Amino acid sequence: MRALISVSDKTGVVEFARGLRELGWQVIATGGTMKLLAESGVEVINISDVTGFPEICDGRVKTLHPKVHGGLLARRDDPNHLKALRENGIEFIDMVCVNLYPFRQTIAREGVTMDEAIENIDIGGPSMLRSAAKNYKDVTVVCDPADYDTILAEIRGYGNTTPRLRLQLSAKAYTHTAEYDAMIATYMREKAGLDEKLFLEFDLVQPLRYGENPHQQAKFYRSGERVPYSLAYARQLNGKEMSYNNIQDANAALAIVREFDEPFCVGLKHMNPCGAAVGRDAADAWTKAYEADKVSIFGGIVALNRPVTREAAELMKPIFLEIIMAPSFTPEALEVLSTKKNLRLLEVPMEKSDAKQRQLVSVTGGLLVQDLDLETRPVTADMCVTEKRPTERQLADLDFGWRIVKHVKSNAIVVVKDGRTLGVGAGQMNRIGSAELALKQAHAQGVTEGLVLASDGFFPFDDCVSLAAASGVEAIVQPGGSVR
């Protein structure tokens, strides 16, 4: 039995090759892989000794040869194939172990040139993977170091890999080469200014119990590109498995949290904030956000942009919550909160990044793609269009409300005072309805003066402004654009 090994990621390859040799396999290798194996004391055959042809073009051509692909593709049960191999002096190759040039890592480097990117496009590797994967009934194809131990265990146990494992590895290899080609195609198309095709790559995080409703099947996938404030890369420290609706709500909460640099907390229900506040620290921000709407937060989701301390944990523990998210939890906070077995605690990466991100929204039979809105222009005094100028406190509250209302379902109105929401009017078919809801909530807390109001859309009529003025609102921020 013969194995051909040619890897860029050399993790575990020496141990794998040594294991194959101990099981009686011959090991063939190329360039750097051969050098590493030989220096590590593994008996290895140079690929050039198999092909009878040297590596040429700075290593661009080394395995593209009939003695490689004939040995991989020949069917062991086809007399014509066997005859062709004998006549041409070609021997079987029973395993290919290949991982590809690091194209993704190369193009991710700042300042990388196109020439550098092109030199990291693997040609021979994908060709060998595809040949071996096509002939999976007889050939084992390996593209992931994580599979080395499983393969060695099967050979030790059965004398060779099982047909089932070879089929699984074949599917994995084709997935790997498809992702690799899509990545290269995307890069080249961007350089060429072409956008009529869109290739997407997502990996399964977990199957979900069901979707938005119990009769809908669902799964959770993540993109190959790690980004901050992403639930897909969160670490769950406690609680039940996340549901489809949990994930949607948690994602909406994280979008709000990333708006703030100062200590901040938001409570959220059904993808709308019900209470949000800035504070001195996590405990203070939570207290203010909770007091903004003690009723709606019941069974909700909480997200903070500061580590959860014991003090904050003890304040949150008495309240029934589904999820608490933060950049971290102190050991003392975990001790307090983990006694609630169903409470999901998620540690979410929250480092700042200016990297451009895409937002994908599915429509029936299609997909909308836009840049993710990561820019919120601060509210400043020079934006004022009235003779009366806002105070510094009002400006701070207007800026706070502007960042919150961006994430409320339209028509959206948010009423704010002293760095916390007092009322949130969401999702009404007319703007006055949302204003009435938000102001009613603020007045129910006994606050009837010193308010500011933020609107996610312009006012087509003066009804909202008149209502606000009569309800204790002293300043308004809105995008403008009304012809009236």
Where is each model-derived feature located?
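Non-catalytic interaction/clamp surfaces of large macromolecular machines
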Residues: 145-146, 150-198
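Mobile "lid/hinge" segments at catalytic clefts and subdomain interfaces of large enzymes
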Residues: 128, 135-148, 169
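Short, charged, surface-exposed secondary-structure boundary motifs
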Residues: 38-40, 54-61, 150-154, 333-337, ...
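Short hydrophobic/aromatic-enriched beta-strand-loop microsegments
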Residues: 25-28, 41-54, 96, 140-141, ...
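Glycine-rich nucleotide/cofactor/substrate-binding loop typically near the N-terminus or early
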Residues: 32-103
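Active-site/ligand-binding-proximal alpha/beta "capping" segment
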Residues: 76-123, 130-133, 383, 387-392
